[in-house]
A protein has these predicted regions:
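Core catalytic lobe of class I
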Residues: 1-216
Length: 216
């Protein structure tokens, strides 16, 4: 639901013919960010839709709203009212790589935002795990000393709480993976990507995979 200022006319090219379909009244309402009132019209459009989504959402359900810096901070306030501040779960940062330019008055904008809310305290959620690339990566990030059993099997000592330490064998750690936090490093699609459909705010399969596995 981006405030994209986009032109939503549809162009269809047939052999020897090019057709252009202007948006209907319904489409203009659905994308009222193209109206003269700008952000105010956009918020007037999205607010009743968020209310409807909340009504349709199961008590165990979650909602992820994908936005960028244009209106994210405004929509967050709307979602706090619609879903309740207590049901806010995360502001997920979708960070993607790119060629950074040296700007005169700001840093390069290199992320989008996904606001995650639950419908209620009954919300279903499962942590998402990524595989470690190597044992070396694990040791470097965890800054843990490697120990060895008499048979050569390597392990680390992890904090188990109450001052106790437990053995964690590295082969098991590698299989388990690392739990993902609220900063997701996933590159955006370029036009040559196989999964690209040419839609400017298309989500990648990897991003959708995380959403589905965490909340379904």
């Amino acid at each position: 639901p981006f405030d994209s200022k986009a032109d939503y006319r549809t162009k269809v090219t047939l052999p020897g013919v090019e057709l252009e379909q202007k948006p209907s009244v319904i489409e203009q309402f659905a994308y009222s960010d193209t109206w003269s009132d700008g952000t105010a019209s956009y918020l007037a459009m999205i607010t009743p839709r968020l209310v409807l989504m909340r009504e349709l959402l199961a008590d165990t359900g979650s909602i992820y709203v994908h936005l960028d810096w244009h209106v994210g901070h405004y929509v967050k306030l709307v979602m706090d009212e619609v879903f309740g501040k207590r049901n806010f779960r995360n502001e997920i940062v979708w960070h993607y790589s790119g060629w950074n330019k040296q700007l005169q008055s700001s840093f390069e904008k290199r992320h989008d935002t996904l606001f995650l809310y639950g419908k209620s305290d009954l919300q279903y959620f499962a942590s998402y795990f990524e595989k470690w690339e190597s044992k070396e990566e694990y040791v470097k990030k965890r800054k843990q000393k490697i120990h060895f059993e008499s048979d050569g099997r390597d392990y680390v000592l992890s904090d188990a709480g109450n001052g106790e330490r437990i053995k964690r064998y590295l082969d098991e750690v590698m299989l388990e993976g690392v739990v993902v936090d609220d900063v997701w490093h996933i590159d955006k699609l370029n036009n040559s990507a196989k999964e690209s459909v040419g839609y400017s705010t298309q989500k990648t399969k990897e991003l959708l995979r995380r959403v589905l596995q965490a909340s379904c």
